């Protein structure tokens, strides 16, 4: 099973498709979770997911706006998609039948 932030990063990469690079992934996570996200955490997690074989990456063309640096674009590999689907299914089974999730914690 994936860790929580690994799951969030993979979902962001999947959602962004061809536009999944470090900055866009960070913005997508912050916007969707409404939580601050540390740039270093995103890049460390991307590197770890790539080392696990769940993500692939390639460099785009250098741009003057980035001081001549190229963006590094990420994509889910087939194994990454399988692990993502399995993790989401596992989480779904874990929360099945938990009335507290339907009714709110302690009636809140």
Regions flagged by a language model, labelled:
Residues 70:
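Exposed loop/turn and edge beta-strand positions of beta-sandwich/beta-sheet ligand-binding modules
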Residues 29, 33, 59-61, 78:
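Short, well-ordered turn and helix-capping elements at secondary-structure junctions
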């Amino acid at each position: 099973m994936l860790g929580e932030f690994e799951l969030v990063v993979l979902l962001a990469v999947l959602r962004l498709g061809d536009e999944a690079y470090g900055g866009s992934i960070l913005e997508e996570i912050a916007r969707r979770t409404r939580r601050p996200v540390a740039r270093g955490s995103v890049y460390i997690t991307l590197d770890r997911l790539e080392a696990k074989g769940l993500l692939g990456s390639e460099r785009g063309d250098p741009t003057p706006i980035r001081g001549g640096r190229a963006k590094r674009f990420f994509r889910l590999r087939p194994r990454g998609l399988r692990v993502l689907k399995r993790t989401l299914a596992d989480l779904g089974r874990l929360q099945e039948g938990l009335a507290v999730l339907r009714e709110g914690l302690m009636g809140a």
